[in-house]
């Protein structure tokens, strides 16, 4: 299985990602032909140049805009429609949507508005579309199955933006790093090292941050940045292989705790279930049973990860009348799942997207989000749910 590791000693930006992928062998004409499907072929030219950064070779990717003043601001739903209509390779399309989605949510949080209302000043521009979609196309071309990233340098100072001078890291980058729990450090360089586009790419696509995973290294692509820095301004993209995961699916270990109760009022049992979820239980369910002396009771079953077992045991003893518990460790198979956010006419809805061996099998809007929006807009729950499901299936069709 092919994996990629973004090694970012000098930070990360969209053009650096593109340069590193082109340096790894992604054909320039392939990217240009695929990007033309976005309907922007007449608006840009993508070129490369071999450059030196502190004595080290790197490949500089440059997006030359043919009209710097003719691009209107775009919203996230417009960008999603543009990408979906382009008939890109499935994984490249999905990754591109995921990156723009992450950026829309971050920008919305910074400005205090819904993601679908964000004006993409820089991100909606053609150069950023090329950087983001081009990077996703390159990773797909190299058949990368898993992406990892190093800790990111914070940079420092200020940078000029559409709203004036901003401190570095800029707010959108900080929001992304906070949401995705990215490890940060300072290398003492007082410049912008991580751009919003670069942060969105590594945050949305990476399975983890920190040290590189164990891999057999095949080659390294070097993407050059624009600024002159005290260290080589290069993104180092490692390409390697790891053993493929089992074909039978994703296995997870869980602990099952059970107890039978016949002397608890239902109100107390309801509260106990709430406390079990708060303690880290994955699932809690109660089944009616007949106990000794023909007394009616309930069988309480708790499923939890091993890390939450002690807390769930303590909660059962504290909140129920049980004098003992049964325990067994089980293996379960689960689909690969991702929680995504989508814009709808009623507001943002979280959607659970489930896959198995690269095939998308299930897409489900979250009940609570639909219920909250139904109450807010005084609409039937089904109306909100069906609207969210239609948007989700358009972005992530099954199969």
Curated annotation (Swiss-Prot):
Key words, A-Z: Nickel
GO molecular function, one term: lyase activity
Annotated family: Belongs to the LarC family.
Name listed for the protein in its UniProt record: Putative nickel insertion protein
Species the sequence originates in: Thermosynechococcus vestitus (strain NIES-2133 / IAM M-273 / BP-1)
Lineage summary: Bacteria, Bacillati, Cyanobacteriota, Cyanophyceae, Acaryochloridales
């Amino acid at each position: 299985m092919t994996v990629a590791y973004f090694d970012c000693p000098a930070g990360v930006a969209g053009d650096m990602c593109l340069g590193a992928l082109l340096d790894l062998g992604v054909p320039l004409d392939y990217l240009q032909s695929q990007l033309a499907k976005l309907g922007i072929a007449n608006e840009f030219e993508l070129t490369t140049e071999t450059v030196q950064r502190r004595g080290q070779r790197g490949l500089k990717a440059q997006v030359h805009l043919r009209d710097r003043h003719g691009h209107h601001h775009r919203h996230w739903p417009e960008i999603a429609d543009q990408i979906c209509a382009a008939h890109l390779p499935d994984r490249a399309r999905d990754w591109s949507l995921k990156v723009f989605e992450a950026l829309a949510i971050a920008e919305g949080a910074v400005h205090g508005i819904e993601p679908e209302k964000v004006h993409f000043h820089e991100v909606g521009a053609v150069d950023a579309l090329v950087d983001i979609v081009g990077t996703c196309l390159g990773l797909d071309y190299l058949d990368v199955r898993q992406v990892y990233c190093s800790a990111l340098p914070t940079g420092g100072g200020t940078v000029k933006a559409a709203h004036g001078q901003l401190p570095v890291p800029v707010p959108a980058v900080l929001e992304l790093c906070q949401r995705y729990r990215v490890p940060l450090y300072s290398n003492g360089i007082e410049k912008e090292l991580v751009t919003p586009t670069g942060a969105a790419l590594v945050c949305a696509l990476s399975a983890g941050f920190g040290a590189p995973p164990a891999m057999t290294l095949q080659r390294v692509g070097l993407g050059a940045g624009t600024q002159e820095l005290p260290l080589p301004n290069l993104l180092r993209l490692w390409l390697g292989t790891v053993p493929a995961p089992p074909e039978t699916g994703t296995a997870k270990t869980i602990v099952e705790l059970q107890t039978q109760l016949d002397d608890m009022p239902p109100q107390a049992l309801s509260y106990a279930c709430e406390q079990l979820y708060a303690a880290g239980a994955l699932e809690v369910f109660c089944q009616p049973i007949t106990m000794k002396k023909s007394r009616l009771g309930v069988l309480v079953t708790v499923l939890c990860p091993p890390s939450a077992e002690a807390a769930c045991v303590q909660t059962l003893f504290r909140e129920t009348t049980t004098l003992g518990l049964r325990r067994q460790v089980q293996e379960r198979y689960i689909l690969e799942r991702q929680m995504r956010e989508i814009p709808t006419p009623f507001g943002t809805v979280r959607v659970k997207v489930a896959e198995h061996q690269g095939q998308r099998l299930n897409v489900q809007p979250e009940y609570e989000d639909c219920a909250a929006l139904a109450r807010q807009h005084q609409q039937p729950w089904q109306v909100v749910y069906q609207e969210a499901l239609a948007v989700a299936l358009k972005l992530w069709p099954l199969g």
